[in-house]
Design a protein with these regions (language model features):
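Ligand/cofactor-recognition surfaces for anionic moieties
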Residues: 1
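N-terminal "arm"/small-domain region of PLP-dependent enzymes with the aminotransferase-like
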Residues: 4-65, 73-74
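Short, basic and Ser/Thr-rich N-terminal targeting/leader segments
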Residues: 28-29, 80, 129
């Protein structure tokens, strides 16, 4: 999810966010479950434009699906984001967010107060891929700066740490990241109706949607 503006009440966005409007054939208000695999193209030129990303549209279900698209748009709208990508799990979102900014030889600085599954993902899987993970005590935001060097590609934290529920100093660490040119990635465990990390300087927001969807 990437930052943009928002204006509607969150309750309205939760119900009506995204580009879906009532079905013109059935007048159904709820978003249908589209069981898609592939899509029909209007012409060879249409297909060419879609694959060349010259115009928006559905290409293949492993890339996009109309039901997923509404979910992505709705979550992005709730967070005040430009766009979102739905993945298979919260752990996939955590890995995806890091692997988009870091590669072998790079490092990230992560809060010590995070979900155990994420700690294992970072401490074992990311390190096996060559991405060093440095853990910082968030009780002092300067700990993130102390662990930063020219190979640091991201800061990572949870809004409310799982399971301690201590509040992460988003604004302070985001400001350190801004000065260092490093994005702060936040797993918004608090849900956007309680906290919007973008409002406090986060660059990327991720979710495990089973927590609140």
């Amino acid at each position: 999810i990437f930052m943009t503006t928002k204006s509607r009440h969150p309750e309205t966005v939760a119900l009506h966010g995204g580009n879906f409007r009532s079905d013109t054939t059935t007048n159904a208000v709820a978003v249908p479950i589209y069981q898609t695999t592939s899509y029909e193209f209007n012409s060879c030129e249409h297909a060419s434009n879609l694959f060349a990303l010259k115009e928006l549209g559905n290409i293949y279900s492993r890339i996009m699906n109309p039901t997923n698209a509404v979910l992505e748009e709705r979550v992005a709208a709730l967070e005040g984001g430009m766009a979102a990508v739905a993945l298979s799990s919260g752990q996939a979102a955590s890995a995806f967010s890091i692997q988009n900014v870091a590669r072998a030889g790079d490092n990230i600085v992560c809060s010590t107060d995070i979900y155990g599954g994420t700690w294992n993902l970072f401490n074992n899987t990311l390190r096996a891929l060559g991405i060093d993970v440095r853990f910082a005590d968030p009780s002092n935001p300067d700990n993130f700066k102390k662990l930063t060097d020219d190979k640091t590609r991201a800061y990572y934290a949870e809004t409310l740490a799982n399971p301690k529920l201590n509040v992460f100093p988003i604004e302070e660490v985001a400001e350190i990241g801004r000065k260092e040119g490093i994005p702060l990635i936040v797993d918004n465990t608090a849900a956007p109706l309680i906290c919007k990390p973008f409002d406090y300087g986060a660059a990327v927001v991720i979710h495990s949607l089973t927590k609140w969807i």
